[in-house]
């Protein structure tokens, strides 16, 4: 847009300089042009002449605007005269007034037709136009170069941003696809309420190879109801099925047998262990002999109860006695 305005300004300045050049030939030419009203019309653009886009006329006092501002009273009288004459255009009413006052106009003194000051103004205008044209051309060229460089930088920046976005999207998609395979299994701390149902792994390092070994120990899910060993006598036997039974021999013995076997395997594979003897004895200890007829917990047992359905620890002799 600015380049177009500069070009338009140059065109108008050239037209103005060409029209002003008509009056600088000689005095006779100036008088001839002075008598020709059409040759005294000069068009001025808004860029060079300010607010006006219309043409101006050349007078003895320089360029003047064709539009005339009238006072309120004069404008009322003029438009009343125009309406009485029946003219559509104000210029026709002005022409009628000039013709009607021709006798009075001839009595007026003649105008000074010496246009030396106009030649000086013309030369100044030409120099100003030439300098302004050169400056505007240089400015337009520099602006064009700056805009071209700015467009190139913008294109390069846009291309770099696009490539970066594509690369980030590709890398994120690749990480999404391969993220599950790169993750290593982490050691979990079994502290929840449901951890008792899962096997627990204990790492026992070997003194010779310094490699950790995972030895799973399965623990029976215990529920501590805070019942002492003497409360088992209140139950009065095993008359009902699906009740809480204390000191279940079958499952507890099987579980301890499994623990003993696994502990013996681990102890045979490693001669020394950093664990203390008390923790080892907890896993490898065997329960004391149980009495099926005396339904009381031993002193070494901590009073924990286990829930079983059926009659897992009852012998066939007890069942036969109850049936009789």
Curated annotation (Swiss-Prot):
Pfam families linked to this entry: TCP
Location(s), subcellular: Nucleus
Location of region: Disordered: 122-215, 261-297
Alphabetic keyword roster: Developmental protein, DNA-binding, Nucleus, Transcription, Transcription regulation
Alphabetical GO biological process terms: leaf development; negative regulation of cell population proliferation; regulation of DNA-templated transcription
Segments forming domain R: 144-162
Single Gene Ontology MF annotation: DNA binding
Tissue expr: Expressed in cotyledons, particularly in the vascular region, in leaves, roots, stems, buds, flowers and siliques.
Bias (Basic and acidic residues) ranges: 144-167
Limits of the TCP domain: 50-108
Protein's UniProt keywords contain Nucleus: yes
Assigned GO CC terms: nucleus
Biased composition (Low complexity): 127-142, 261-281
InterPro entries, sorted: CYC/TB1_R_domain, TF_TCP_subgr, Transcription_factor_TCP
Compositionally biased residues, Polar residues: 168-192, 200-212
Function, as annotated: Plays a pivotal role in the control of morphogenesis of shoot organs by negatively regulating the expression of boundary-specific genes such as CUC genes, probably through the induction of miRNA (e.g. miR164). In association with ABAP1, exerts a negative role in cell proliferation in leaves, possibly by inhibiting mitotic DNA replication. Participates in ovule development.
Subunit composition and interactions: Forms a heterodimeric complex with ABAP1. Interacts with SPL.
Protein name: Transcription factor TCP24
Originating species: Arabidopsis thaliana (Mouse-ear cress)
């Amino acid at each position: 847009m600015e380049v177009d305005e500069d070009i338009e300004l140059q065109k108008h300045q050239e037209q103005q300089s060409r029209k002003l050049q008509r009056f600088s030939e000689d005095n006779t030419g100036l008088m001839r042009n002075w008598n020709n009203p059409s040759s005294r019309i000069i068009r001025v653009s808004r860029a060079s002449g300010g607010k006006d886009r219309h043409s101006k006329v050349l007078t003895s006092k320089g360029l003047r605007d064709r539009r005339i501002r009238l006072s309120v009273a004069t404008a009322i009288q003029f438009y009343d005269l125009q309406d009485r004459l029946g003219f559509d255009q104000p210029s026709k009413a002005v022409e009628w007034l000039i013709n009607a006052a021709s006798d009075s106009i001839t009595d007026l003194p003649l105008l000074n037709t010496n246009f030396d000051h106009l030649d000086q103004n013309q030369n100044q205008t030409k120099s100003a136009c030439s300098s302004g044209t050169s400056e505007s051309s240089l400015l337009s060229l520099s602006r064009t170069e700056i805009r071209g460089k700015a467009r190139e930088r913008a294109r390069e920046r846009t291309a770099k941003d696009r490539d970066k976005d594509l690369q980030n999207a590709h890398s994120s998609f690749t990480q999404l696809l391969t993220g599950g395979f790169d993750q290593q299994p982490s050691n979990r701390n079994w502290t929840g309420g449901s951890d008792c149902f899962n096997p627990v792994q204990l790492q026992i390092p070997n003194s010779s190879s310094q490699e950790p070994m995972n030895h799973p120990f399965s623990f029976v899910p215990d529920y501590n109801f805070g019942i002492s060993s003497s409360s088992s006598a209140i139950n009065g036997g095993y008359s009902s099925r699906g009740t809480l039974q204390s000191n279940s021999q079958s499952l507890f013995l099987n579980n301890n047998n499994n623990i003993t076997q696994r502990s013996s395997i681990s102890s045979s594979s490693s001669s020394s262990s950093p664990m203390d003897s008390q923790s080892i004895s907890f896993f490898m200890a065997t329960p004391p002999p149980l009495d099926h007829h005396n339904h009381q917990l031993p002193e070494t047992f901590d009073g924990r109860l286990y829930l079983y359905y059926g009659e897992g620890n009852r012998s066939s002799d007890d069942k036969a006695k109850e049936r009789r």
